[in-house]
Amino acid sequence: MNRNWLRSLTILAWAACGLAHADILIGQTADFSGPVASGVKETAAGAKLWIDRVNANGGINGEPITLVSMDDKFEPANAAANARELITRKKVVALFLTRGTPHNQAILPLLSEYGVPLIAPSTGAMVLHKPVNPWVFNVRASYQHEANRAIRHLSLVGLSHIGIVQVNDSFGSDAVKGAQEAFTQVNGTPLFTETYDREKPDFTKIQAAVTSQNPQAILFLGSGSAVVNGVRAIRATGSHAQIVTLSNNASDGFIKALGDNATGTIVTQVFPYERSLASPLVKEARQLQKAATGDDRVTPAMLEGFAGAKVLVEGLRRAGKQPTREKLRDALETLRRYDIGGLEVSFSPTSHSGLDYTDLSIIGSDGKFTR
């Protein structure tokens, strides 16, 4: 009897020990094999820099953080299915760095249904900013803010014949609102606005518009390989229009895919210059990258993941031991001017935007972003 009792006690002790030091599971669904895979992998690598650093120092109250990533191939239906599995079967505490506007929209109903926070979604969709969703915590500026700045910049440098090319999904229809607002602010109108199908991009109509209208610049609202192929189609018409696209394409993979069409392309950015040692955020990321790989070079996409991981970790720290989904959400609400390295992140019951930093970069002849 005593032997059985002791055996049971030992099992319970091991179980308690395992519970006390169980991994904190964080879920991610994103495109790891489709048209935006290169940027997704860079963003995840940036997040891993900070998560690995935290785990090496004991994790959160002795509990390591594990990022559970699933490939949705950039399909909204897959993103929703992955998110449901992460929430219901993997029992993640939060979702993190989910990529894509329609993909995040597909996930939104699950957040309130299961009471799960979504931290640092890798999209600037306004629907995640306004109205405030109590379960969504953004760590980057909106696409509308980026598109607005891009058009105002083009106007400032004297370009008025500006065309717009946009994908025909919720990302395109969201981002174009920022461009339209900017045209109103500078008393201008777009030379043309053309759309293309996200599933089966065909740029024939866009080539015709470029040929007939001869734009000085084109704001291209799309993602990854579609933008690469669209720019190739535009250049095939003989057009030398200035190409501008948004931060969702701010990755090394995008530059490489553009090939000979990369140089001179303007890409909006939502984090500081990745080669600037004046930015504490960049400096820290570069130091950790060098320690991990021997090379201190980081990319804008990596900085997005790095910044998001800093906010995630701080939320977990404030949530206390064995953080729950609700504790984490409540903890994130307490972030006020939280310094992640020269940038301050703030959340409140009336604002979950976190940051509104935007900048412009241009791809140089060396195949790197410059500012």
Question: How should each PLM-predicted stretch be described?
Answer:
Residues 1-9:
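Bacterial N-terminal signal peptides that target proteins for export
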Residues 17-22:
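Sec/Tat signal peptide C-region and signal peptidase I cleavage site
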